[in-house]
């Protein structure tokens, strides 16, 4: 396919048009008085959102050159979302500002490479300043609530629910977001370990109203292979029957013949039993079975370690205070594993989290850690309509990411104030030549933009507010929600330092690429592509009736 090539100013102007198209759509969502954006969907109702990255992801422009500009800034939003989970709109605004002012300077004859060096120098200074300003969150759940509220666009209910979930499961715990059946947004905590495997047969159910298997003080048999014939299990079954306690079997699978025998005995009342499949796949399954064994004080019966099912003894079985199994999940509460064993397993998983490079593996390890250490909280998001539910779920996920970021690197004054305070770090900073110093000035101007935009979205005059905030010190800033200048820490207008840092780093990184671009190549559009030829006739079928 033929290519179209644009050089120099022409290429940069087209890219900038794309940047502005995307950034202008995204930046209206910033701040407590940010506006909604409605996204048309091919199927179903339109999606209403105030989430910057959701807006950015929807944007595709017709002109391939403009589209490239938009896609580059989309990358800023996505990367910031991946790294910090929030701050996508801020990153987009910063990128637009650095690119806009930077291109004017390049057009006026500045050296793009020197500008980029100056920008990088300034960003480094600002990031160091932000780190110095950051205050640790620790176990201050009020701060966590404030961060969550700000990130959820000022929704106090979401803020308090996330703080409650964090309080219940601590830092190690996992918090997941699900859609609720009703209109209320609630938080539920699953104590103990839960994994996503339910009973193999509904005939094991003990509570028919809830369709659940409920067991008090059961023994737990953990086997890493398929149980093909019941004969292998008979010795251990006979021993558990004599104790009169129920038995939970966790195995890779159970053959239909062996399962039928267990079900018949369960229905006769001679066995209190339930069987579930082992969670996970491959190596992760082995690790999860080992976790369950450590939590319940049992042993994984595995031929790899020289143990056979027919030789299993009672001391290889784990125990727990209570086990609940429904059609989808198994929950083990208060396993009888010893505290030292669980603690060393937790340390081991934490070390694996540190060393892994895969985000997917990290997420799965984090889940395993939560199941052993803190428990799992589920935030059920409810709303009157599906459209509202999706919008609310976006905000809850943002708020959750922001609180995690705040716990990691602390908090700074919100509402764009942290950037205004960081201008002080650039005051005496000079580059090695004039263009580098211009690069520093570009960043100095750009970091005012988030506050200007928050103020503009609140319907006020940006320049006046920025000047007044500059005159103040520390956490003195503008609260756009109440239209008051005040100390932002005391009123809970705070942002995670990590989000503030990542937004600027990613914006400057893409902007630097932009300014140093000299040529853009895209596919050439064909004016009138020829219509495809009609398929041939159905010759040779004349004899059919």
Swiss-Prot record:
Give me the reactions it catalyses.
ATP + H2O + a folded polypeptide = ADP + phosphate + an unfolded polypeptide
Q: Where in the cell?
A: Cytoplasm
Give the keywords, sorted.
ATP-binding, Chaperone, Cytoplasm, Isomerase, Nucleotide-binding
State whether keyword Isomerase applies. Answer: yes
Residues annotated as binding ATP: 29-32, 50, 86-90, 415, 495
Main localization (coarse): cytoplasm
- Name by which UniProt lists this protein: Chaperonin GroEL
**Organism of this sequence:** Porphyromonas gingivalis (strain ATCC 33277 / DSM 20709 / CIP 103683 / JCM 12257 / NCTC 11834 / 2561)
Where is the organism placed in the taxonomic lineage, from the top?
Bacteria, Pseudomonadati, Bacteroidota, Bacteroidia, Bacteroidales
């Amino acid at each position: 396919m033929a290519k179209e090539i644009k050089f120099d100013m022409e290429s940069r102007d087209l890219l900038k048009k794309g940047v502005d198209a995307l950034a202008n759509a995204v930046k209206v969502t910033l701040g407590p008085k940010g506006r909604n954006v409605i996204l048309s969907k091919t199927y179903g109702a339109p999606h209403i959102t105030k989430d910057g990255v959701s807006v950015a992801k929807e944007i595709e422009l017709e002109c391939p050159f403009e589209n490239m500009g938009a896609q580059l800034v989309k990358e800023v939003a996505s990367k910031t979302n991946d790294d910090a989970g929030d701050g996508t709109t801020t990153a987009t605004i910063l990128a637009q500002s650095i690119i806009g002012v930077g291109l004017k300077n390049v057009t006026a004859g500045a050296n793009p490479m020197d500008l980029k060096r100056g920008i990088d120098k300034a960003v480094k200074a600002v990031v160091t300043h932000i780190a110095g300003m950051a205050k640790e969150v620790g176990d201050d759940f009020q701060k966590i609530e404030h961060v969550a509220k700000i990130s959820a666009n000022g929704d106090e209910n979401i803020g308090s629910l996330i703080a409650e979930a964090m309080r219940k499961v601590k830092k190690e715990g996992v918090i997941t977001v699900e859609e609720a059946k009703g209109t209320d947004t609630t938080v539920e905590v699953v104590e103990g370990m839960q994994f996503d495997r339910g009973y193999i047969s509904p005939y094991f159910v003990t509570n028919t109203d809830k369709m659940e298997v409920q067991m008090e003080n059961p023994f737990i048999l953990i086997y890493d292979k398929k149980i093909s014939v019941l004969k292998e299990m008979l010795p251990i079954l006979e021993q558990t029957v004599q104790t009169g306690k129920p038995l939970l079997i966790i195995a890779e699978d159970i053959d239909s013949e062996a399962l039928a025998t267990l079900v018949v005995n369960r229905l006769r009342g001679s066995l209190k039993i339930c069987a579930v499949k082992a969670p996970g796949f491959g190596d992760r399954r082995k690790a999860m079975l080992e976790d369950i064994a450590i939590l319940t004080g049992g042993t994984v019966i595995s031929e790899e370690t020289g143990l056979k099912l027919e030789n299993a003894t009672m001391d290889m079985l784990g125990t727990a205070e209570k086990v609940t199994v429904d059609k989808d999940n198994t929950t083990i509460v208060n396993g009888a594993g010893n505290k030292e064993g669980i603690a060393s397993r937790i340390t081991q998983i934490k070390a694996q989290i540190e060393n892994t490079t895969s985000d997917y593996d990290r997420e799965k390890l984090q889940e395993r850690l939560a199941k052993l250490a803190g428990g799992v909280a589920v935030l059920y998001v409810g709303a009157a309509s599906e459209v509202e539910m999706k919008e609310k779920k976006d905000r809850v996920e943002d708020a959750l990411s922001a609180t995690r970021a705040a716990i990691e690197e602390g908090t700074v004054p919100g509402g764009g104030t942290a950037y205004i305070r960081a201008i002080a770090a650039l005051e005496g900073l000079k580059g090695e030549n004039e263009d580098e110093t211009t690069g520093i000035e570009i960043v100095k101007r750009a970091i005012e933009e988030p506050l200007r935009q928050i103020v503009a979205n609140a319907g006020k005059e940006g320049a006046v507010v920025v000047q007044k905030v500059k005159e103040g010190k520390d956490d003195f800033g503008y609260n756009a929600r109440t239209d008051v200048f005040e100390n932002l820490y005391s009123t809970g207008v705070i942002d995670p330092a990590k989000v503030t840092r990542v937004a600027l780093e990613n914006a400057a990184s893409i902007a630097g690429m932009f300014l140093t671009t000299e040529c853009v190549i895209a596919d050439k559009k064909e004016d009138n592509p020829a219509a495809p030829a009609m398929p041939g006739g159905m010759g040779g079928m004349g004899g059919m009736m």
